[in-house]
Structure formats: C-alpha cells, structure tokens
Amino acid sequence: FHDFTPSGLCEIHHFLFGDLYDWAGKYRIINIEKRERLLAGRSVWYSNDEEIPNDLESAFSALYQPNWDSLTREQFVSAISRCFPRIWQVHPFREGNTHTVVMMMTFFVEQHGYFMDQELLAASAGYVRDSFVMASLDQLSEYEHLERILLDAVQSAPIHYDVETLC
C-alpha cells in the first residue's frame, strides 16, 4: 500500500469495514461527539462534517514535511506520533477511525523500512486509542504515551510471531 492520502484512508476503511457498513470508506455526513473517560466525559473536538475534506488535506500535508528516510528510528517515531493523531482527530468516519488510522500508520512505517509489532498494538488497543485522544487536544496535546508505545512497536528488524499463540 502506497497511497498516503485521504483517498487512501477511505480505501483502507472500506477494506476493513466494507462487509459491516454500507457507508464504509465514505466520510460521515453528521457531526459527532464521543465521550472520553480521559477527558471526564468530554469529547475531543472532531472535524465538522463539512470540513472533513479540507481538514484531512491539511493533516496529510504533515506527512510530506520531513525527509522521513533521513530520520533515526527515534526521530521517526516522534514525527509519526505528531502526524497521525492529526489525521485521527478529523475522525472522517462514523466508526472505525482508530483501526483505520493505525492500519495506515503501519503501512507508512513499513514503507519507510521499519516493521510494526501488530501483536503489541492489538494487545494495547485501548492504550493506543487513549494515546490518540491525549495527542489530539490542540495546545494541550500530549504525545508521550503514543511515542512510548510506538517506540516499542516500531522495529528495525522483522518481527517473528509465534503462530501457536495467534490462533
């Protein structure tokens, strides 16, 4: 997968959720709020449904800023910890945003020569989502938690999974 654009995000969402939702891969047409326990029941400020295309273009533009291949692994992780929450905060779909953004982030990591520990991310799905919440608070954003798990998940060498434990 090489399409790191809003249309690529829609393609991933449709692939993941096309069997579940008629609207898979299509931007939501309603505004949403999701109460977050981390925010004492308040919601992250997601994009207004009419602003989704513009907000996604802006969020994706951050992916084209750094010279990714010149970064160390730690710098790479720090940079993606700031870019992908911007995409997530748009929340272009009614459901499945975290899974879709993490899938795209995994493809992006692998496109740049690293490997993503899928077992770790799956086992820590709640922590990953909470980390996206904390990294999506505008001036109050906190990236430490997302960086921490991605430093563990983004590896320089292939990850060998124990097939016995996966089944």
Q: Which residue ranges define each predicted feature?
A:
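FIC/Doc superfamily catalytic core
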Residues: 1-167
